[in-house]
């Protein structure tokens, strides 16, 4: 009890001295001080835990701020998206309003144009009615002149004039009628109040249009002023935006974004107003063109009337010539018809003959085709049988290879068994083997399996021999039946050849079925062989395991000689059975060779049959050389067969791949066996090493016994070393605290870095999503651009067509100008009006020149827009290239991020391992501290004991002679002291080893800390680089968004332009339809006039014919024909007179 209390006292005293409490301590107050000390330790630990928890709480609060940052960023992003959506909504509203306004303007234009067209239609209808009335009046007058009931005066030979009552009365005109004073017949005024004078209406319309043009010019000036004001305001806003962007370098607030969006909307409004101004200018130009076209249509109508009158005269002359030609043609037609009837009769006879010949030829062709189809089918079957034969040969070859492989395997098994016997003999010589009940049973099972394999191979050989005998019989049968086939072919009877071919076909089909069965048997045999191979592998593994267990047992224990003799006998039996199996295997090989020779014979027979069939096929082809054109169908079948052969080659490659897989498995098994042999060699080497270690340990024991004697001298040195150890332990404690603080800081930093990495991963994921969205939007824009380009190309084509039509109209316009000049010469009365019209025409020409200049400007603008489009296409290409670069960079960054994630995971794992090692170290340090304190206490106790013993020894030296009985007790004490010294020496060695291990661990920890510091610095650098790259990416994304926004604006402007062009096209199409309707109306009128003209011509021809008859009758009667000639001349002049 006293020793325990003294130990407690010493321990508490030392701890108090370490903590700085140097006050005196009584023995009575020991338990109280112990409790107080334990409470102090508990409070310090609780303080540490509180500090750790407070630090963790602070970290969590910092983490909360860090976690809230992405939410804040998302909130700002959502605000931006909301603003953008609002802007898009405003844009859509503006677009809808503009579209409604454009539709209203188009409606107004259409209503005006319809009113104008109605007006023109009414005028044209009125003109047509007037012309119809004039034509009717002229027709009536002509009829009156022709059919007046005047008496014909006939001049007799005596010079008298006599009235003829019974002849038709003819009008005698001595002189032409005097020209009428009135230039034209009075035209009744139209009853329709909507019809008015065209010139007055045109003048009024021109004045109205001029007023509208002036109003539009005033509006244009106002709009230009407004545009200038807007441009100034935009410049001021841009300056303010630049100032605000300089003020807000860190980030953009939603107010700034709203200002930017407002500026962009203002710019869009200005662009839209410019587009509207251009549209109004174009509308003015179109109105002016429409006025010119109306004037031109007016002139063309007048010219057409004159042209029709001239054509009527020409047609009268042409009709007489046509009548003569018609008579000639009728005569020629009658002759041609007669000859054609004769030729038709002959052709019908020839056609009947050809039809009969064609039917006969078709019947022959059908027969030949049927025979050819049969021959082709038989050829295809023979080809398929050849392919099956080749497949069988490949399978036989594979089986030979597998048999060779199995023979090699058996040889390897024999070699391994020999090695096993050698090892067993060696083990028997060294230690002896202890027999168990399991090994002979496994060997029996192995031998039984080998016997079953032998029986199985024998059965398969018998099956193969049976199949080959059947095939040889079938071949011999076919060979016997060949000579009559040849005789039949020599005779040339096709029917006998067909029967023989059908028989051979049936035989080949049977052979095919047999071969298929044989193939199925071979496949099943292959499956069974693979299963048996797996079983052999399992048995081989089990044998290896048994060998390993036997080796272990041989190392652990020794076996008697009779067990070894039994094992050797069993081994000899197994070897004899293996030899017997190898002999059987060689017999099987010889049988396989015989089978292969028989296969070769069968192959030669089949080749002969194939040659005979090819000879028959050649004969058929020589007989039917006319149908060579239809042999192209055979090529398709050959191609299909080639495809089948390719598929079968692929199957063969798969089979070879399986065989290579089996070879790899065998190589792996060999490698495993080699590894097991190496492991056995390593175990033997280790055994020899351990024996040497045992000898060295015995030598060390002897050395330690010598060292124990020197320990008494080293005790003094050890006391000094313990003091140094205390100092070093205190320094180590300080370093340990410092390291713990640094580790805590590093863990905090690592946690922060992990959180930052998580946030960056989220940002990267968002960027990926945005990049994908941009990709989809770019694809959509490209599709829209392609569609727009197509529409523009179609519109350009339409414009080219309209330009061509305008050129045609210009040509017609020149013709109409020429006709107008003729009309001006004819119409002297309209000179004043023509002068006024010429002045107006000059003004219109000036306006036309102005319009041409405007058109040139418009063309220059179009070229400029085309250049802008090309530049924008280049920009789009650059954007695509940049996008690809960004995509590649993003992929690189993804790879880097994945690498960083892997590094982070490795760092986390390292940190976890460091934490675990640190905990282990702490536990070891605590244990070592406890042990050190115990050893120190023991050392102090020993020191006190040694001091007391020294005193006692001095006393005993003085009292040695007196107290010989106390010597024995002192010797016992010395022996106990020696034991304690031995224990102390051993403890010292352990302590030195532990100190060395601790020093090594500290060095490792310092190196790891340095590595961690370097890695953290690298991570910081990477983080800074990633931040810079993210900023660059954000700037690039912002620029891309701006460019996409600009491209969207341009596309919107292009859409508006395309809509305007479409509207223009619709207007032009509507005008074309109206013009086509007018032309159709005019054509109908022209047809009516032509019909009237034909009627007049007929009447004239009838009159001419009657006059000629009258002249002939007068000549017969002997009357003079001069008055009749005058009468003939007069009606020729009458139409001119009437036209005048």
Curated annotation (Swiss-Prot):
Q: In the UniProt record, which is one GO cellular component term?
A: cytoplasm
One MF term from GO for this chain?
protein homodimerization activity
Localization: Cytoplasm, Cytoskeleton, Microtubule organizing center, Centrosome, Centriole
Positions of post-translational Phosphoserine modification:
439, 688, 1130
Keyword list (alphabetical) reads: Coiled coil, Cytoplasm, Cytoskeleton, Disulfide bond, Phosphoprotein
Site features described as Microtubule binding, chain residue numbers = 101, 104, 108
Q: Per the record, which residues fall in region Disordered?
A: 1117-1140
| Entry-annotated residues carrying Phosphothreonine | 1121, 1134
- State the Gene3D superfamilies in the record: 1.10.287.1490
Coiled-coil region(s): 75-151, 199-416, 447-644, 668-1036, 1079-1113
UniProt signal peptide: none
Recorded hits in InterPro entries, A to Z, give: Centriole_BasalBody_StrucProt
Q: Name one GO biological process term.
A: positive regulation of establishment of protein localization
Composition bias type Low complexity, residue spans: 1117-1131
**Free-text comment on this protein's domains from its UniProt entry:** Coiled-coil domains are critical for microtubule binding via the formation of a two-stranded coiled-coil structure in homodimers.
| PANTHER family with a match to the protein in the record | CENTROSOMAL PROTEIN 135KDA, CENTROSOMAL PROTEIN CEP135
Q: Which family does it belong to?
A: Belongs to the CEP135/TSGA10 family.
Known role: Centrosomal microtubule-binding protein involved in centriole biogenesis. Acts as a scaffolding protein during early centriole biogenesis. Required for the targeting of centriole satellite proteins to centrosomes such as of PCM1, SSX2IP and CEP290 and recruitment of WRAP73 to centrioles. Also required for centriole-centriole cohesion during interphase by acting as a platform protein for CEP250 at the centriole. Required for the recruitment of CEP295 to the proximal end of new-born centrioles at the centriolar microtubule wall during early S phase in a PLK4-dependent manner.
* The name this protein goes by in its record: Centrosomal protein of 135 kDa
